Amino acid sequence: DKEWEVVDITEKAACFSTVNLYLRNAWYHQAIKQFIDQGEIGELAILRICHMTPGLAPGEGHEYEGPAFHDCGMHYVDIARWYAGCEYKTWHSQGVNMWSYKDPWWVQCHGTFQNGVVFDITQGFVYGQLSKDQTHNSYVDIIGTKGIARMTHDFKTAVVDLRGVTQTERIEKPFGGKNIDVLCDLFADSIETGTRNPKLPLIRDSAIASEYAWTFLHDAYTHDLPAIGELETLEQIWERRRNMKNGYGLLQKP
Protein backbone atom coordinates (compact mmCIF):
# COMPACT_ATOMS: atom_id res chain seq x y z
CA ASP A 1 0.00 0.00 0.00
CA LYS A 2 2.82 2.40 0.84
CA GLU A 3 4.42 1.69 -2.54
CA TRP A 4 1.27 2.75 -4.38
CA GLU A 5 0.93 5.78 -2.12
CA VAL A 6 4.37 6.87 -3.31
CA VAL A 7 3.33 6.23 -6.93
CA ASP A 8 0.26 8.41 -6.46
CA ILE A 9 2.25 11.25 -4.86
CA THR A 10 5.00 11.27 -7.51
CA GLU A 11 2.64 11.05 -10.46
CA LYS A 12 0.69 14.05 -9.20
CA ALA A 13 3.84 16.09 -8.56
CA ALA A 14 5.07 18.65 -11.09
CA CYS A 15 8.60 17.28 -11.19
CA PHE A 16 10.60 14.38 -12.58
CA SER A 17 11.00 11.23 -10.50
CA THR A 18 12.57 7.88 -11.24
CA VAL A 19 13.92 4.72 -9.63
CA ASN A 20 16.96 2.61 -10.37
CA LEU A 21 15.60 -0.50 -12.03
CA TYR A 22 19.21 -0.98 -12.97
CA LEU A 23 18.89 -3.81 -15.48
CA ARG A 24 17.03 -1.50 -17.86
CA ASN A 25 20.11 0.72 -18.00
CA ALA A 26 22.53 -2.14 -18.62
CA TRP A 27 24.26 -1.87 -21.98
CA TYR A 28 23.61 -5.56 -22.74
CA HIS A 29 19.84 -5.29 -22.28
CA GLN A 30 19.77 -2.11 -24.36
CA ALA A 31 21.69 -3.87 -27.15
CA ILE A 32 19.38 -6.88 -27.08
CA LYS A 33 16.24 -4.73 -27.03
CA GLN A 34 17.46 -2.74 -30.04
CA PHE A 35 18.18 -5.99 -31.91
CA ILE A 36 14.67 -7.26 -31.16
CA ASP A 37 13.09 -3.94 -32.18
CA GLN A 38 14.88 -4.18 -35.54
CA GLY A 39 12.93 -7.37 -36.22
CA GLU A 40 16.04 -9.55 -36.28
CA ILE A 41 14.52 -12.38 -34.23
CA GLY A 42 11.04 -12.15 -35.74
CA GLU A 43 8.19 -12.07 -33.25
CA LEU A 44 9.21 -12.21 -29.61
CA ALA A 45 8.03 -15.56 -28.24
CA ILE A 46 9.98 -16.81 -25.22
CA LEU A 47 11.85 -15.01 -22.41
CA ARG A 48 14.14 -17.12 -20.23
CA ILE A 49 15.93 -15.40 -17.36
CA CYS A 50 18.14 -17.04 -14.75
CA HIS A 51 20.15 -15.61 -11.87
CA MET A 52 21.61 -18.13 -9.43
CA THR A 53 24.56 -17.28 -7.18
CA PRO A 54 25.96 -18.25 -3.77
CA GLY A 55 24.83 -14.80 -2.65
CA LEU A 56 22.96 -13.43 0.34
CA ALA A 57 22.07 -16.36 2.59
CA PRO A 58 18.75 -16.52 4.44
CA GLY A 59 18.90 -14.91 7.85
CA GLU A 60 21.73 -12.52 6.98
CA GLY A 61 19.75 -9.35 7.33
CA HIS A 62 17.75 -8.52 4.20
CA GLU A 63 14.46 -10.04 5.34
CA TYR A 64 12.84 -6.62 5.57
CA GLU A 65 13.04 -6.58 1.76
CA GLY A 66 11.61 -10.08 1.60
CA PRO A 67 13.10 -13.44 0.58
CA ALA A 68 15.53 -13.60 -2.33
CA PHE A 69 12.88 -13.75 -5.05
CA HIS A 70 11.57 -10.35 -3.99
CA ASP A 71 14.75 -8.67 -2.76
CA CYS A 72 16.70 -9.59 -5.90
CA GLY A 73 14.16 -11.30 -8.13
CA MET A 74 11.96 -8.24 -8.59
CA HIS A 75 14.60 -6.83 -10.96
CA TYR A 76 14.22 -9.89 -13.20
CA VAL A 77 10.44 -9.67 -12.94
CA ASP A 78 10.80 -6.08 -14.14
CA ILE A 79 13.19 -6.76 -17.01
CA ALA A 80 10.97 -9.56 -18.36
CA ARG A 81 7.99 -7.16 -18.34
CA TRP A 82 10.17 -4.51 -20.02
CA TYR A 83 11.04 -6.89 -22.86
CA ALA A 84 7.47 -8.16 -23.26
CA GLY A 85 6.06 -4.64 -23.32
CA CYS A 86 2.86 -5.56 -21.51
CA GLU A 87 1.52 -6.99 -18.26
CA TYR A 88 1.72 -10.50 -16.83
CA LYS A 89 -1.31 -12.72 -17.46
CA THR A 90 -0.69 -16.19 -15.96
CA TRP A 91 1.95 -17.71 -13.67
CA HIS A 92 2.95 -20.79 -11.71
CA SER A 93 5.80 -20.80 -9.20
CA GLN A 94 7.82 -23.64 -7.73
CA GLY A 95 10.10 -23.09 -4.77
CA VAL A 96 12.44 -25.05 -2.54
CA ASN A 97 13.04 -24.44 1.16
CA MET A 98 16.77 -25.06 0.95
CA TRP A 99 18.45 -26.12 4.20
CA SER A 100 14.91 -26.40 5.63
CA TYR A 101 14.77 -22.63 6.07
CA LYS A 102 11.26 -21.21 6.57
CA ASP A 103 11.17 -19.41 3.19
CA PRO A 104 12.10 -20.64 -0.29
CA TRP A 105 15.53 -19.31 -1.27
CA TRP A 106 15.16 -20.70 -4.80
CA VAL A 107 12.09 -20.01 -6.93
CA GLN A 108 11.27 -20.59 -10.56
CA CYS A 109 8.18 -18.94 -12.03
CA HIS A 110 6.84 -19.50 -15.52
CA GLY A 111 3.78 -18.21 -17.31
CA THR A 112 2.54 -15.84 -19.99
CA PHE A 113 2.11 -12.16 -20.75
CA GLN A 114 -1.08 -10.64 -22.11
CA ASN A 115 0.41 -10.56 -25.61
CA GLY A 116 1.16 -14.29 -25.53
CA VAL A 117 4.89 -14.07 -24.81
CA VAL A 118 5.96 -16.95 -22.56
CA PHE A 119 8.44 -16.46 -19.71
CA ASP A 120 10.37 -18.33 -17.08
CA ILE A 121 12.34 -16.63 -14.32
CA THR A 122 14.71 -18.57 -12.06
CA GLN A 123 16.32 -16.89 -9.06
CA GLY A 124 18.11 -18.20 -6.00
CA PHE A 125 21.09 -17.59 -3.74
CA VAL A 126 21.64 -21.32 -3.30
CA TYR A 127 24.20 -22.02 -6.02
CA GLY A 128 27.13 -23.94 -4.52
CA GLN A 129 27.28 -22.04 -1.24
CA LEU A 130 29.88 -24.39 0.25
CA SER A 131 31.73 -25.30 -2.93
CA LYS A 132 35.50 -24.93 -2.67
CA ASP A 133 35.59 -22.50 -5.60
CA GLN A 134 32.32 -20.64 -5.97
CA THR A 135 30.66 -19.81 -9.27
CA HIS A 136 27.27 -18.67 -10.54
CA ASN A 137 24.86 -19.08 -13.44
CA SER A 138 23.30 -15.92 -14.84
CA TYR A 139 21.80 -15.55 -18.29
CA VAL A 140 19.09 -14.10 -20.47
CA ASP A 141 17.90 -16.26 -23.37
CA ILE A 142 15.37 -14.66 -25.70
CA ILE A 143 13.79 -16.68 -28.50
CA GLY A 144 11.83 -15.30 -31.40
CA THR A 145 10.08 -16.87 -34.36
CA LYS A 146 13.18 -16.37 -36.52
CA GLY A 147 16.24 -15.75 -34.32
CA ILE A 148 17.60 -15.48 -30.80
CA ALA A 149 19.43 -13.09 -28.50
CA ARG A 150 21.22 -14.13 -25.34
CA MET A 151 23.57 -12.86 -22.67
CA THR A 152 25.79 -14.28 -19.96
CA HIS A 153 28.09 -12.53 -17.50
CA ASP A 154 30.63 -13.18 -14.76
CA PHE A 155 30.03 -9.87 -12.91
CA LYS A 156 33.13 -8.50 -14.63
CA THR A 157 32.40 -9.02 -18.32
CA ALA A 158 29.08 -9.46 -20.12
CA VAL A 159 28.83 -11.30 -23.42
CA VAL A 160 25.90 -10.75 -25.79
CA ASP A 161 25.28 -13.23 -28.61
CA LEU A 162 22.92 -12.01 -31.33
CA ARG A 163 21.70 -14.38 -34.07
CA GLY A 164 19.24 -12.63 -36.36
CA VAL A 165 17.95 -13.04 -39.89
CA THR A 166 20.49 -10.57 -41.34
CA GLN A 167 22.97 -10.03 -38.50
CA THR A 168 25.18 -12.21 -36.33
CA GLU A 169 27.13 -10.41 -33.66
CA ARG A 170 29.04 -11.16 -30.48
CA ILE A 171 29.60 -8.21 -28.12
CA GLU A 172 31.86 -8.41 -25.09
CA LYS A 173 32.17 -5.44 -22.71
CA PRO A 174 32.64 -4.71 -18.99
CA PHE A 175 29.59 -5.78 -16.98
CA GLY A 176 28.73 -2.35 -15.57
CA GLY A 177 27.38 -2.97 -12.07
CA LYS A 178 24.28 -1.11 -10.87
CA ASN A 179 24.46 1.57 -13.61
CA ILE A 180 23.82 4.51 -11.29
CA ASP A 181 25.91 6.68 -13.62
CA VAL A 182 23.63 5.88 -16.56
CA LEU A 183 20.54 6.70 -14.50
CA CYS A 184 22.04 10.02 -13.37
CA ASP A 185 22.91 10.97 -16.96
CA LEU A 186 19.38 10.21 -18.16
CA PHE A 187 17.89 12.16 -15.26
CA ALA A 188 20.19 15.14 -15.86
CA ASP A 189 19.32 15.10 -19.56
CA SER A 190 15.63 15.16 -18.66
CA ILE A 191 16.10 18.17 -16.39
CA GLU A 192 18.18 20.09 -18.94
CA THR A 193 15.77 19.48 -21.84
CA GLY A 194 12.59 19.74 -19.79
CA THR A 195 11.40 16.48 -21.36
CA ARG A 196 11.44 13.19 -19.54
CA ASN A 197 13.81 10.71 -21.20
CA PRO A 198 11.71 7.66 -22.16
CA LYS A 199 14.48 5.36 -20.88
CA LEU A 200 13.87 6.56 -17.31
CA PRO A 201 11.90 3.97 -15.31
CA LEU A 202 8.76 5.19 -13.59
CA ILE A 203 8.13 4.74 -9.88
CA ARG A 204 5.06 2.83 -11.08
CA ASP A 205 7.33 0.31 -12.83
CA SER A 206 9.06 -0.44 -9.54
CA ALA A 207 5.77 -0.85 -7.68
CA ILE A 208 4.49 -3.23 -10.36
CA ALA A 209 7.70 -5.29 -10.27
CA SER A 210 7.58 -5.47 -6.49
CA GLU A 211 3.92 -6.47 -6.47
CA TYR A 212 4.38 -9.23 -9.04
CA ALA A 213 7.53 -10.53 -7.32
CA TRP A 214 5.51 -10.88 -4.09
CA THR A 215 2.65 -12.47 -6.03
CA PHE A 216 4.92 -15.03 -7.69
CA LEU A 217 6.65 -15.77 -4.38
CA HIS A 218 3.34 -16.27 -2.58
CA ASP A 219 2.20 -18.55 -5.41
CA ALA A 220 5.10 -20.87 -4.58
CA TYR A 221 3.66 -21.30 -1.08
CA THR A 222 0.41 -22.64 -2.57
CA HIS A 223 2.20 -25.60 -4.19
CA ASP A 224 4.31 -28.42 -2.82
CA LEU A 225 7.28 -26.71 -1.15
CA PRO A 226 9.98 -29.28 -0.38
CA ALA A 227 12.35 -28.68 2.53
CA ILE A 228 15.74 -30.04 1.50
CA GLY A 229 18.87 -30.03 3.63
CA GLU A 230 19.46 -29.13 7.25
CA LEU A 231 19.77 -25.91 9.23
CA GLU A 232 23.21 -27.10 10.34
CA THR A 233 24.38 -26.67 6.75
CA LEU A 234 22.99 -23.14 6.71
CA GLU A 235 24.95 -22.40 9.90
CA GLN A 236 28.11 -23.58 8.09
CA ILE A 237 27.26 -21.21 5.23
CA TRP A 238 26.82 -18.29 7.65
CA GLU A 239 30.15 -19.04 9.29
CA ARG A 240 31.95 -19.27 5.97
CA ARG A 241 30.43 -16.04 4.68
CA ARG A 242 31.34 -14.19 7.90
CA ASN A 243 34.97 -14.98 7.24
CA MET A 244 35.08 -14.59 3.45
CA LYS A 245 37.11 -11.77 1.95
CA ASN A 246 35.91 -12.28 -1.61
CA GLY A 247 32.44 -13.65 -2.23
CA TYR A 248 28.97 -13.00 -3.57
CA GLY A 249 26.77 -10.43 -1.85
CA LEU A 250 28.81 -10.22 1.33
CA LEU A 251 27.40 -7.86 3.94
CA GLN A 252 29.57 -4.92 4.92
CA LYS A 253 31.11 -5.30 8.35
CA PRO A 254 30.72 -2.30 10.69
Regions found by a protein language model. Give the residues of each.
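Glycine- and charged-residue-rich phosphate/anionic-cofactor binding loop of Rossmann-like
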Residues: 167-173, 190-208
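Short glycine-enriched, charge-decorated loop/helix-capping segments at active-site entrances
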Residues: 63-67
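Short catalytic-loop micro-motif centered on adjacent basic/acidic residues
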Residues: 17-20, 92, 200
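A contiguous active-site-proximal alpha/beta segment in oxidoreductase catalytic domains
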Residues: 1-58
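Alpha-helical elements of Rossmann-like donor-binding domains used by nucleotide-donor carbohydrate transfer enzymes
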Residues: 5, 27, 31-34, 79, ...
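Short arginine-rich
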Residues: 212-222
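Contiguous beta-strand/loop segments that form the cofactor/metal-binding neighborhood of enzyme cores
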Residues: 71, 77-157, 174, 181-196, ...
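Residue-level signal for the nucleotide or nucleotide-sugar donor/cofactor binding architecture
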Residues: 27, 71, 137, 178, ...
